[in-house]
Swiss-Prot record:
Family under the similarity heading: Belongs to the UPF0677 family.
Gene source species: Frankia alni (strain DSM 45986 / CECT 9034 / ACN14a)
Gene Ontology molecular function, alphabetical: methyltransferase activity
Stretches of the chain forming a coiled coil according to its record: none
Alphabetized SUPFAM superfamilies for the sequence: S-adenosyl-L-methionine-dependent methyltransferases (SSF53335)
Protein name: Putative S-adenosyl-L-methionine-dependent methyltransferase FRAAL5401
Membrane-spanning segments: none
Length: 306
């Protein structure tokens, strides 16, 4: 598949960045079969099947074992990541927040699987082909949202605030935002713009959850690219070519946590390494992807000035 990033590129769930959303759903499907204590996503496997990539379907449904393709660490990280964001949303909405925004929602099914409080509105933003596919597929499965689900079919590089408002979003009300697994697929300046816009659209007492990846030390990114290329080679041997190293943006960028803190967000966080330990999962070993130092951060906006 063609996957090199360029300005204005688009995708579906079988190509480019969209394929990474499908691969993440594969990991959630495998994790759900292995350990419903941390994650229970009954829609992951059916959504992957509907995308139509045979290898990913067989992995998601258990017809092919993950050994050698989906490493155990990816499955374990899928478990703790899902749990972190699930708990974030439920805690936020149980405080009275009734607006939820999921940026780059991909195959996320939280609008269908979480026990949202009555009156919660969940806004999902993603490329038009992605949100149309998920809406159509889940409707065909007979799935019913557990919240008032609204979609904004828009590229996050375009005027997504206008699309969000058109769907009914009210920036005067507190909101719970997530940018899950998104920021590494944005250029550094686009990441800043996204976080600035989230802040501008956030009333006091809004909440946010995302990831903070430390800036690389010399040699870190070369090792990361080599590791991603090794992973892609394993997939190519099975006639699936995600070309993962070419989908991300590299180089230094503003780290998420201090950037948001400077804009009035009070944040806490926990590293992937500590989350794995907290849930009794095996530690990371050869961490060429630098996952262990990624911190999942969440917090509240209490200030109205930058």
């Amino acid at each position: 598949m063609t996957s090199t990033r360029h300005d204005g590129d688009t995708w579906d769930l079988a190509s480019s960045v969209g394929a990474t959303a499908t691969m993440a759903a594969v990991a959630r499907a495998i994790a759900t079969r292995a350990d419903r204590r941390l994650i229970d996503d009954p829609f992951a496997a059916p959504l992957v099947r509907a995308v139509g990539i045979d290898l990913l379907t067989r992995l998601a449904t258990g017809d092919v074992p993950p050994d050698g393709l989906v490493e155990q660490v990816a499955i374990d990280v899928a478990k703790v990541r899902a749990r972190f964001y699930d708990e974030f949303f439920l805690e936020a909405t149980n405080t009275g927040i009734t607006q939820v925004v999921i940026l780059a929602s991909g195959l996320d099914s939280r609008a269908y699987r979480l026990p949202w409080p009555i009156g919660t509105v969940v806004y999902e933003l993603d490329q038009p082909r992605v949100v149309e596919f998920k809406t159509r597929t889940l409707a065909a499965l007979g799935a019913v949202p557990t919240a008032d689900r609204r979609v904004a079919a828009v590229d996050l590089r375009d005027d997504w605030p206008a699309a969000l408002r058109a769907a009914g979003f009210d920036p005067a009300r507190p909101t719970a935002w997530s940018a899950e697994g998104l920021l590494g697929y944005l250029p550094p300046e686009a990441q800043d713009r996204l976080l600035d816009t989230v802040t501008e659209l956030s009333a006091p007492e809004s909440r946010v959850a995302t990831e903070n990846r430390p800036n690389p030390k010399p040699g870190d990114e070369d090792r990361t690219k080599e590791a991603l290329n090794r992973i892609s080679e394993r997939w190519r041997a099975h006639s699936f070519d995600p070309d993962m190293a070419r989908l991300r943006y590299y180089g230094e960028r503003n780290e998420t946590a201090p950037y948001l803190a400077d804009r009035g967000w009070a944040l806490t966080g926990i590293s992937v390494r500590d989350l794995l330990a907290a849930h009794g999962l095996p530690p990371l070993r050869d961490d060429d992807l630098r996952m262990g130092d990624v911190r999942y951060v969440s917090g509240v906006r209490n200030k109205t000035t930058k």
